[in-house]
Every structure is written in C-alpha cells, then in structure tokens.
Amino acid sequence: MDMGKGRPRLKLPQMPEAHPQKSCAPDIIGSWSLRNREQLRKRKAEAQGRQTSQWLLGEQKKRKYQRTGKGNKRGRKRQGNVEQKAEPWSQTERERVQEVLVSAEEETEHPGNSATEALPLVPSPTKAVPADQCSEAHQESIQCQERAIQNHSQTHLSPTTCQGIAVLQHSPKMCQDMAEPEVFSPNMCQETAVPQTYPPKALEEMAAAEPLSPKMCQETTVSPNHSSKVPQDMAGPEALSPNMCQEPTVPQEHTLKMCHDVARPEVLSPKTHQEMAVPKAFPCVTPGDAAGLEGCAPKALPQSDVAEGCPLDTTPTSVTPEQTTSDPDLGMAVTEGFFSEARECTVSEGVSTKTHQEAVEPEFISHETYKEFTVPIVSSQKTIQESPEPEQYSPETCQPIPGPENYSLETCHEMSGPEDLSIKTCQDREEPKHSLPEGAQKVGGAQGQDADAQDSENAGAFSQDFTEMEEENKADQDPEAPASPQGSQETCPENGIYSSALF
C-alpha cells in the first residue's frame, strides 16, 4: 500500500514541472525570433561601425602621409608616369623653339634674308614643320648665295629667289651651267663657238681677220643637217678643214647660204689654187650672189694665179678619184657664165691646202678632164687691163718646180690640168647637160634660173668665145711656152683664168 501511495506522488511533481516548460515554450518561441533579429541588427551595426572606423583610420593615415611626405611608393610612380606623358609635348616644343632660334640666328648673319627672321618664337605643333622647311630652304639659299658671289658678283640673293631655286631643285652643276655658260670643255667650245655664240653679222665682220683653227672647223662641220642659218654662222671665218670641204660637196644637204659663205673672201695659199682653178670644188657656189655679197674687184685676179708657185704635194690627192662621170663637168658648165665673178670671190679665200685637196676628191674629176684642160688659152690685153695690179709671180714660178719631190711629168700634167681651159672641155661641158649634181641644181633653183638654161646658154657662149679667143691669144702666148702638149700643160694657168674672167 505504501508503494501505491508513493507512486502518484512521484508522478505528480514530475507533471507540473513538465507543464511549465511546455507552457513557457510557446512564449519563448516568439521571444527567440525577436532576439535573433536584434542580434543580427547588432552584429550588422557593429560590422558597419568597424568598417567605418577602419575607413576613417585609413583616411586619417593617408592625410598624415601626404602632409609629412611619407606615403605609398606606387602612388608616386603613377603620378610620375602621368607627368612624363605630359612632358614629351614640352620637349618637342623646346626642340622646335631651338631650331627656330638657330635658323633666326643664321638669318641674322645674312641681312638679305629678312623675311624668315619674322618667324614667331612661340612654337606650336602646327608651326614646327614649316620651321624644318625654312631651315632646308635656308641651306639652299646659302648655297645659292655662294654661287651668286662667284658667278654674278652679287653678295646676297633674296629669299624668294633662293626658295624658287630650291623648288626647282637645281643641282650645283645645273646652277653652274646656268651661271657660267662660257666655261665649257674644249669640245663643247669647238662645237658651239661658231654656230651659237656669234650672230651672222659678227661673223661676217670677223671673217677677214679671224680664221678658225682646224679643230674648230672640224667640230663645226660634224653635224651637216643644220638649217640654212647655221651654215651662215659656220662659214664666216673660213680656214676650212678637210671635213668642212667634204660636207658642202658630198652630202650637199646645205642650202645656198652655206655655199655663198664658203666663197667668202679668204686668201688662198698656192697649193689651193691648183684644185680651185677649174674643177670648182664647190659646185653650189652662186658667183652672182657671192660677188654681190663680197663686192670683190677684178684687181684681185692676179692673186688667183699662184698655181705653180707651190710644191707638187697636192697632185696625188687631186688625181686619186679617177673613176668618174661627167657630172663635175656639167657642174662647172652651169656656173661658167659667172666664172669671172666666182674667181673674184674665191681669190682671197683663207682656205688651207688640205681643204681643197679633200674637196676635190668628192667631186670625182676624172683623169680625162685633167688632160682636156691642157690646151692653153692666153688672155688678151683687155683681160690684163682689167686686173691692173702687178703680178707677184714671175713666169718662172708658173712652171712646175722639179725639186726633191719624186713625181713624174704625168703628175705635173695632172696638176696643171685643172687650170688650163680648152675647147675640148667646153665641148664636153656642152654634151651632158641634164646630169647636173644636186648641189648645182639647188643653186640654180635658188637663183631663179633653170639648170638647163644655164647649161645651154653658158656652155654655148663659152665654146664660141673660146674658139675666138684661141685665135686672138695665140699671138700673145709666152715665147717660152713649148708647142708640145706637155709644154702646154706646164704653162702658166693664168691664161685660163684671165680668159674665163671675160665671160
């Protein structure tokens, strides 16, 4: 029974202890949720407070470091980089300023260049490029000034002229050529002296006193295709070289003016008259126009008789072209009507011996023509009266000189042949009338006369007059002249010249 009584007692105290816990549990549940929220709010506030406190402390520390100079090295480096990025613009500007200052200082040394001194000293990136150009232009201006001092005796060129030269990009050689056109090489001088530097009038005035050197004449005749005006300039001072004589005869591309000028007054040496007398190395010479230009008097005729006062050296060259045609005879027949005037013009030609030696070769004068020229024609007293000047050569000089030259009589015959005009040559000149050389045809066209008319009139009159003159002049022949053909060949060619002067 005690057991029963005691059991519920034990149970009872346990029950009421459990109920209050259960009863308190729902009340506490609500409170626990509230507590958690509050705790979260507190924790958040504390965290924010800590963050704010740390931030404030950091800010205060930064301010202290900046004031005292102690701070973050990285921050200093970044600031230095930013400053360096800004500095290159200033450095380029400084360099440009220095360039402008240097150019201004150099220009102050040259007072003529006043325009570039006004450049602004405050530089800008847009104005830097013109400064470089100004420096280059200034260098070329200095070069131009130095050239001008040497060439034009001018101390300073204006900047505009120097810039113009810089724009045109004249090299120093070009400037020298522009400034000194007279300092050429010898070859250039030989080529350009006669046809370019002197006007035709000056050459005509200089023709009497200024014979050109052989090299000069050779260079002037290299280009045969000059216009008519260029040969006038070329032919003024005529100590003609072999090339000069070959050009007007063989190519025959020169006009009448070339041929007229070739016959300008020059003094022939004794050797030249042997080839000049009858073969006429220049078939295109218009004696009428040449005599009008030159105004040569018949007094100069005796000087053309110097054929035999020369050595026999000229005979080989004059005889070499023996394979010939009758064209040179025709060319001679064309201008025989004006033979006297042609003689007057060719008396004083200052042509060297070699010129006509070479000039006779392209004419293709045959061996037969030399033989046909052998019959002597003695001029009458009328012709001698027309040339009143005393002859400088005695009859002895007219005879060929047998000296150390190793030439046979045949060479002498051929030498004296071209000067002695005969009836046979006149007859031969009458026959082939229509095969004139190009030079003679050009001459006839320029004179306004037909070549055929000249052939018919001149050759006919020439043959008739020769037949009459032979009969008259036989009495006037020198007693020393032998009757044989060789003797007639060796006689003085003055007779042929005087007889031709009548025509």
UniProtKB/Swiss-Prot annotation:
It comes from Mus musculus. Residues 1-10, 61-79 have a biased composition (Basic residues). It is found in: Nucleus. This is Hemogen. InterPro entries: Hemogen. Residues 7-87 are annotated as: Necessary for nuclear localization. One of its GO terms (cellular component) is nucleoplasm. Keywords: Developmental protein, Differentiation, Nucleus, Phosphoprotein. One of its GO terms (biological process) is cell differentiation. Expressed in hematopoietic precursor cells. Highly expressed in bone marrow, the red pulp of the spleen and round spermatids. Weakly expressed in peripheral blood cells. The keyword Phosphoprotein applies. The modification Phosphothreonine is found at residue 286.
